Amino acid sequence: MKQYAIQPATLEFNAEGTPVSRDFDDVYFSNDNGLEETRYVFLGGNRLAERFPVHSHPLFIVAESGFGTGLNFLTLWQAFNNFRSEHPQATLQRLHFVSFEKFPLTRDDLALTHQHWPELAPWAEQLQAQWPLPLAGCHRLLLDQGRVTLDLWFGDINELTDQLDATLNQKVDAWFLDGFAPAKNPDMWTPNLFNTMARLARPGATLATFTSAGFVRRGLQEAGFTMQKRKGFGRKREMLCGVMERCLTPTISAPWFYRSGSEKRETAIIGGGIASALLSLALLRRGWQVTLYCADDKPARGASGNQQGALYPLLSKHDAAINRFFPTAFTFARRLYDALPVSFDHDWCGVTQLGWDEKSQQKIARMLSLALPAGLASALNAEETTQAVGVTTRCGGITYPAGGWLCPEQLTRAVIALATEQGLQTRFRHTLTSLAAQKSQWQLRFASGEAASHDTVVLANGHQINRFDQTQPLPVYAVGGQVSHIPTTPALSALRQVLCYDGYLTPQNPNNRQHCIGASYHRGNESTVWREEDQRQNRQRLLDCFPDADWAKEVDVSDNSARCGVRCATRDHLPMVGNVPDYHATLTHYADLADNKASAVPAPVYPGLFMLGALGSRGLCSAPLCAEILAAQMSNEPIPLDASTLAALNPNRLWVRKLLKGKAVK
């Protein structure tokens, strides 16, 4: 996915007021009655009204080949909402909709189109509020208080399906095969698409499509579906329905990065910061029993305890995985933070990263060459920067208009309080000293001498994540740092955005009239002792970058107010999310991986042991999506990332990359 920005759809409206694609010269829905056609073709064709009450799983997964205006999704959501009202005790509790769209509508066009269906307004307004930027890849939207999940994959469906992770295989309960007519858009209706539909369909899955074209019917039959014709809607004579009656065995293309989940729904999370807080919520939403063990007397005592933290995506001049992951993580984080029913200090004031010297200017130029959507990142010259940030910098940069700052300490504690209301059990002053697999559970031992047993365990305890026998070989390291708290002044109070340079400076928090400036960096140092030199350096870096700025000289660190914390990082600047890998088994099983990829077994891991760590300095950006990824993996649900980006987050990646090249792992 080298292309990051997606071209939005170009629309016009015909005499009936129906939107028409200029790209394909075809209507988005029937001129007669698009809503009733959707109900007939897709809901009726998949027999959803019959299947929902007898569905034996808490989640029903629908996949769709063209999102368009969202009519199919909104109609299904309305029907699912009615089903839940009429059957509150049913096993089926949640709906997951996966859809692909090459040319997404703009938010304005979406809202205009939705005016056709006033009865769908309650659901359409929620969709419009979370409508993502035209950015390639998967956008996960959590709707209806988490009861409905929408995965919007922006891009060409036949390219995207090749990039789907193997964990989506045999998960789909029903397919909506939609899109522009085969005669108008032949590139979509391919054997590759039909085979992908079969690969993702679970045994017994159904499909429905408005077309009755012979090559479509034959292609789906060859892929494994049993097909039949059904009377079409309105003036259309026929449509197609199908059932996956076979049990296919899809191959796993990269077993060394395979992710396994759990059939159980009980876990212990070790941590107390933002990662463990958000993971608790994500698992509780899926019906898990969750116990949180925290070594401290309250949450957010570690790296998540700062007063202000900047929220913006990390971009790289050369690493494609970073450029795929962080923009997606950032947009998901904004949607999640905005939807949380909790209060915490924050201001989405924007973040501007400055090019204060030649090296930083070259770096920013390479970041801008990614051509990300303007709503995510765009260039500023020196004059525009001054207007945006409120102070004179005499340099331009790259701005993130949807970024800003928040209080990690307040957020973490508020999320854990919310999770506690939803059933989270908390155990503070519990320092985990060891864990061992015992039969089908994990035995935990704490410094107090206490012990506990749990079906699964998640390690989300920051820089202490490699303190155990199972995790000691992980290539992670601690980074100590100090953030200085400074009082505002008339000149500093003019700062309207977070400034990033060879450090960062936040606007004042109006609730305490303080700014945060930082942060020092001490790799391999776990000390949380205040340092006078760090305090001085935090100020000096600002002055070095902007020697002529009078406002910068007003930064006063003399009252020695600061906070010291320790982060956990990796050398490739990406988190580690997934199963805890078995280091020794990995080296043994994959000793000849470079020459025997075809016979490789799935990645050796510790069953039931997971991790969410190495978030580095961008935990506020990455933690929400990482928590969602891990909760989905543990629950055997669709994961909202492509396979190559997921591989770049796999805790075993640094070892496996060497083994794939025939190199020794040190």
UniProtKB/Swiss-Prot annotation:
**Reaction equation(s) it catalyzes:** 5-aminomethyl-2-thiouridine(34) in tRNA + S-adenosyl-L-methionine = 5-methylaminomethyl-2-thiouridine(34) in tRNA + S-adenosyl-L-homocysteine + H(+)
The record's EC number reads 2.1.1.61, 1.5.-.-
Q: Which InterPro entries match?
A: FAD-dep_OxRdtase (IPR006076), FAD/NAD-bd_sf (IPR036188), MnmC-like_methylTransf (IPR008471), SAM-dependent_MTases_sf (IPR029063), tRNA_MAMT_biosynth_bifunc_MnmC (IPR023032), tRNA_MNMC2 (IPR047785), tRNA_S-uridine_synth_MnmC_C (IPR017610)
Which residues lie within the region annotated FAD-dependent cmnm(5)s(2)U34 oxidoreductase?
A: 270-666
Q: Give the highest taxon in the source lineage.
A: Bacteria
Q: Name one GO cellular component term.
A: cytoplasm
Q: Which GO terms describe its biological process?
A: methylation; tRNA wobble uridine modification
Give the span(s) annotated as tRNA (mnm(5)s(2)U34)-methyltransferase.
Answer: 1-245
Q: Which SUPFAM superfamilies match?
A: FAD/NAD(P)-binding domain
Name one molecular function that GO assigns to this entry: flavin adenine dinucleotide binding
Q: What does the record give as cofactor? A: FAD
| Family under the similarity heading | In the N-terminal section; belongs to the methyltransferase superfamily. tRNA (mnm(5)s(2)U34)-methyltransferase family.
Question: What does the protein in this record do?
Answer: Catalyzes the last two steps in the biosynthesis of 5-methylaminomethyl-2-thiouridine (mnm(5)s(2)U) at the wobble position (U34) in tRNA. Catalyzes the FAD-dependent demodification of cmnm(5)s(2)U34 to nm(5)s(2)U34, followed by the transfer of a methyl group from S-adenosyl-L-methionine to nm(5)s(2)U34, to form mnm(5)s(2)U34.
Q: What is this protein called?
A: tRNA 5-methylaminomethyl-2-thiouridine biosynthesis bifunctional protein MnmC
Species source reads: Salmonella arizonae (strain ATCC BAA-731 / CDC346-86 / RSK2980)
